[in-house]
Amino acid sequence: MSPVPCLSTCCCFRKIVEYSTMSWFRKSANDSLLETNHDRIPVAPPREVRAPSPRLPPSYQTSNEKMFRVRKAPSEEHTLANYAYVNRSDFDDKQIKHVRVNPGPAHHYIFSIRNDGSIKPGEIAFGVPHRKWAALSLDQEVRVTPFTFQQSEYVGSMILTADFNAKKNVTSEPLNADLMAREFSIQFGGQAFSKGMQMAFRFEDKEKNKTHTLSLVVKSIEGFDIGKAAAAASGASNTDSSATKPKQIEAGELLPNSVIVFDKEEGSMLNLIGKSKGKSAYRSIINPDWDFQQMGIGGLDTEFSHIFRRAFASRVFPPEFIEQLGMKHVRGILLFGPPGTGKTLMARQIGKMLNAREPKIVNGPQILDKYVGESESNVRKLFADAEEEWRRCGANSGLHIIIFDEIDAICKQRGSMAGSSSVHDTVVNQLLSKMDGVEQLNNILVIGMTNRRDMIDEALLRPGRLEVQMEVSLPDETGRLQILKIHTARMREYNKMDPNVDLEDISKRTKNFSGAELEGLVRAAQSSAMNRLVKAGGKAQADPDAIEKLAINSGDFDYALENDIKPAFGRSDESLNRFLSRGMIVWGPEVTKILDEGSLLAATVKNPENSGFRTVVLAGAAKTGKTSLAAQMAKSSDFPFVKVISPEDTVGFSESAKCMALKKAFEDAKRSKLSVLLIDNLERLIDYHPVGPRYSNLVIQALLVLLNAPPPAGHRLFVIATSSDRMFLRDMGLMDVFGDVIDIPKLTTAGQMMNVIQESNIYSDDQLPMIEQKLASICRGEGFHGVGIKHLLELIESARQCEADYRVPTLLNMMEGLALNLYR
């Protein structure tokens, strides 16, 4: 209950002569709305002679009925507070919040009560608006019964007609209905309201430093069932959807987040502005028919349901129920994940789920200011409205939502910036104290968004601050289909998309595409279709006759997928194709066996019954085709995410930079459901050199840690590495972290080498027998220990440059030199 407002105005009253209930009501139509011991303020007569009584089920009522004598409210302040007043010995307002007043056998009215020591036992005091509404005369005896609302009788939204209470107070200046609605919720939160109730409302316009006293009449009330609405919003399957829809009620209790709408009285000079004016703001506190696709959000149903359960479900219950539980609301949510997954779009819609105060959306860098202390002041300003409302009405305060985009810009780890007095540290300290400091606020919800969760100060991530941490990951196939339907809805509506376009097939082919990349794919397909209409010639101009026939077809999507849009968390096809530029030459059953082992390991990773994490190293001499075999394994695995870590990508990196690059690669791989990580040439990555020896211990330790860390639940990772020095890996302990080791052999027989030579297609069939005979002789020599396939291909390419008659002797001479260690 909010305290009775303190007003300084003291007015006189005129005694009302009463003969009967109806005769008093006719006389009082011209009496004052507010009365005190000195004067009155005239108001316009009410539009209705008698408001209908709320029809309430008997189960809503409690016993302990008493007879009371009607008295007038002690002061204007009491009237403005909108309570009926009784002595504590009759009803204690700490135990009884509302009463039902029966002035006659066919009528009853619901009031919220307050104790007042000036009211004698057996008396109940009402303000003039209440006495007019219930047609109560002074000294009239009424039956009063304690009353309790059921959970289905809470106010979701309420429409009130408003007018100036006196002609002398009429002004043409616009009144902000949004500020009025906020002030109304603060003053009257937790009170009972009935259809037709008359009341006085004093609104202080702080922007213009003016005070207005208005007469209000409750026009309609839309209620909802708190329990069923919360269950439906959180995804309960057994909830009747019709039971959660708002419905008209005769009486209900006002909640802090109830939607208040003001309509001006017919013929009134009142000028209202803002979203809470008229029917524009007429909406329920929770929309059970919330449609993510209409809001432009797809693939995030699970995330929304989880956030509602953790952060919003508790806020739809009455404050007194939360106090009985001793519960504190969640004050913060952190949305993190890869770029383009819909974090910002999700945050824009979160505030609309409860119809709370208009969210304050601020970019992280906007907080920073060049002047000393202004950055901290900007943080304090964001919480100023919530602090003021919390001081005034405590638990009855409405929800204030503050959204920080790119929160990592202002909430980095303290001490990570240069200088001990960095402005970033003081901003973090200010935000920490506002969210959960000495003066705790229970009416705020801070939503932060970032791509770099690891940069956020750990004190901000504890319970009580950014307590709910939700990863917004890449959409699955169902989510991708929802997103594609959203971005193609207008095209389908206006028949601008060929009906043969199969969005389900596109969603299957766009593995690991983010929401932003899917939007870009649709945009690229549209551009491809529009390009067909551009006339060829010196000037670029569209063909006006073909514009009406424009239709985006499946070919446009295929072209966009092939050439325009590549997912950031997709396959590194460019790197894989570079490693396989010579193709995959199966020179013997050894190659087939190696590829089969790789396929078996990939299938093991895919199997949901297994752990989903395997590591393998391809070890062999230099130029034996290890990288090509690893690339072929990665490509044939058909995993949507393939990342290549190559020494050439880290040239010039410091040891710390290499470790960060490795860590980021593993983190990116673990964000995808199915991932392959190819680490090429471990020795070069570690900076190993046998002279010394010299190597990077920091990189080795990073690899030991990362290769031992399995992916999160539901994610699967296959790590393939290559190495030319098996002894070094064993000495450094790296061999122990690889679950499987596959040896890559050299070509040691003439038949194996002939398979490669035949694939080159540079020798005629007549030359091949002589080459095979000479190679067999070389292989039998004591100095020949085999040749790597890459080395053999290099020799063949060198021979290709010769004239046709010299290709055979050139190749054989180089092979003989290889046997004599001339080409090692």
From Swiss-Prot:
Top-rank lineage group of the source organism: Eukaryota
Molecular function GO labels: ATP binding; ATP hydrolysis activity; metal ion binding
Keywords for the protein's UniProt record, in alphabetical order: ATP-binding, Cytoplasm, Hydrolase, Magnesium, Metal-binding, Nucleotide-binding, Protein transport, Repeat, Transport
Positions that bind ATP: R582, G583, M584, I585, V586, W587, A622, K623, T624, G625, K626, T627, S628, L629
Family matches, as PROSITE patterns: AAA
UniProt-listed GO biological process terms: Golgi to plasma membrane protein transport; intra-Golgi vesicle-mediated transport; IRE1-mediated unfolded protein response; SNARE complex disassembly
Localisation per UniProt entry: Cytoplasm
Residues that coordinate or bind Mg(2+): T627
Cofactor(s) annotated in UniProt: Mg(2+)
Name of the featured protein: Vesicle-fusing ATPase
Organism listed in the record: Caenorhabditis elegans
